[in-house]
């Protein structure tokens, strides 16, 4: 597949190389970045998009299926990003995109391994957006929806990746990727793209309840409805906190 993509890019007038190392090892990840630096002189943009599926209900899931999904999605993204990170920090420029999924952000039956790995992308992004802020390294996450070969590995799901449904074509995800890879990219944000629609999701926290030092289970039970009420809530992230501190410094 890598060679096919290289050929497509070359035929379109671009320049590309293929590296077939596994992202699931630090050695493989480092070789990917080393090859890119050797061929192009640097790394400006990293899109962590390697992925597999091993779908089963949690009761029936073999832990080997858990491990391999974590290795490719979560560890693989972490390894390649770690290899590229010093390059970007040194030149004070970089754009990183983690590919997440609504299966992790919102949940989906039979994808505990995949969902956990994909939600982990948001955790990495949240931290690296803070660490890269002063170095102009911007880090975001994308949850795409498209008709791809990966989706075709789900039992019972039929796709035609060579001739996808026009409204589920991967090219409808591309504008979001280009935005996150551009000089004008935001940072620390999660975007959703697919079917011609683009949106953003975020973490919110409600006002909370103040009880003091004598709080008990019964107190929480009595106020349970108020505790879970999100009608009055505020977007919250470590990045927002740091940005506010910088404004007030």
Question: Model-predicted segments: where are they?
Answer:
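Substrate-binding pocket helix/loop in short-chain dehydrogenase/reductase
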Residues: 57-58, 62-67
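Residue(s) in the substrate-gating loop at a strand-loop-helix junction
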Residues: 101
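C-terminal helical subdomain
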Residues: 141, 161-248
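The beta1-alpha1 cofactor-binding region of Rossmann-like NAD(H)/NADP(H)-dependent oxidoreductases
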Residues: 20-34, 63
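The catalytic Tyr-X3-Lys active-site helix of short-chain dehydrogenase/reductase
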Residues: 71, 104-107, 112-120
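Active-site-adjacent segment of SDR/Rossmann-fold oxidoreductases
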Residues: 106, 122, 127-137, 183-185
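A short, exposed helix-loop element centered on a Lys and neighboring polar residues
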Residues: 81-82, 126
